[in-house]
Design a protein with these regions (language model features):
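Substrate-gating cap/lid alpha-helix
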Residues: 191-234
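N-terminal carbohydrate-binding/catalytic regions of secreted carbohydrate-active enzymes
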Residues: 32-141, 278, 282-290
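Bacterial N-terminal signal peptides
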Residues: 4-15
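Bacterial Sec-dependent N-terminal signal peptides
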Residues: 13-32
Length: 294
């Protein structure tokens, strides 16, 4: 896996046609990896922009993905993209790593229980007999599945209530993992945009803190889930959904993806099928960049 510093600036505006079920595909400019970081946000969703050679390279990555129900937007979305085209073939194991040739293989550690949180990801057992244990912590997983080359932890609603000190601890812990496992690319992530009111305002602040950390460089990668799920293309421009609290615009899940507005909810993911697809497109884009696409 490439961990070198990609400094090439992309100035080409991509006008592409997508074959994954979207009726209106905008000209999209991929988010740029520069100054030692890359953020996969709402513009990093143009699947047709990924050269076939880098799509194939992305499939060679072995991905560890942990999270609760919101994280299934990635795996469910990936399955829908694969149904559209075998170019996007993927296989997800349940607490195991599949070994399918020519396919993106994902070690899925996902659950609707409260135990797949970041503390669980790090090392902590829930202490409850019969429930998941620290055998699924990132350390234990990497010992059991040393072929893994990428690890992603995705938030549920934790960031709606976390303090800035707790967010800082998350960032420091991931940086320590980066230093400990230099052959694994750890991906930072922002949280979802479901909450409104004071909780949503706090979540947005915490997400900004995560972005600011990633922008410090050191080859950091961010899956900007909040940015992806709050933006939608209206046929001529990107529209971000927000609400206002105390004079501040706060990002909020876009109506195009919100099952409460454009339902139904798709496979218990807290988004509709369109939202799952958009999240999965950005995930492919991110993996292609990790594989070396500039």
């Amino acid at each position: 896996m490439l961990r070198s510093l990609w400094m090439l600036m992309l100035s080409l505006t991509l006008a592409c046609s997508d074959t994954t079920g979207d009726s209106a595909v905008p000209p999209r400019v991929p988010d740029i990896f520069t100054d030692g970081y890359f953020i996969a946000g709402h513009q990093a969703t143009a699947l047709a922009a990924i050269p076939p050679v880098w799509l194939a390279a992305a499939k060679n990555l072995k991905v560890h993905l942990m999270g609760r129900s919101h994280s299934t937007q990635v795996t469910v979305g990936l399955s829908r993209l694969e149904a559209d085209s075998t170019n996007y073939s993927c296989a997800t194991g349940w607490f195991s790593l599949p070994e399918e040739a020519g396919t993106l293989n994902i070690y899925g550690a996902q659950s609707g229980t409260p135990y797949c949180d970041f503390a669980f990801y790090l090392n902590n057992s829930d202490g409850i007999p019969g429930n998941f244990t620290d055998a699924q912590s990132i350390h234990a997983v990497l010992m059991r599945a040393p072929a893994l080359s990428v690890s992603v932890f995705l938030w549920c609603r934790d960031l709606d209530s976390m303090t800035s000190n707790q967010v800082h601890d998350y960032l420091v812990q991931l940086a320590l993992l980066e230093a400990q496992y230099t052959n694994v690319q750890f991906v930072y992530a922002t949280g979802n945009a479901d909450a409104d009111g004071a909780a949503g305002h706090l979540r947005a602040r915490n997400n900004r803190q995560i972005r600011d950390w990633v922008k410090l460089g050191n080859n950091r990668l961010l899956f900007d889930y909040e940015d992806i799920i709050t933006h939608a293309w209206n046929g001529s421009s990107w529209i971000q959904s927000t609400y206002t609290l105390n004079g501040t615009n706060v990002p909020f899940i876009n109506p195009a993806y919100n099952p409460a507005v454009n339902g139904p909810e798709y496979e218990y993911t807290h988004a509709n099928e369109t939202g799952c697809r958009e999240v999965a497109k950005a995930f492919w884009f991110l993996l292609a960049r990790i594989a070396g696409w500039e």
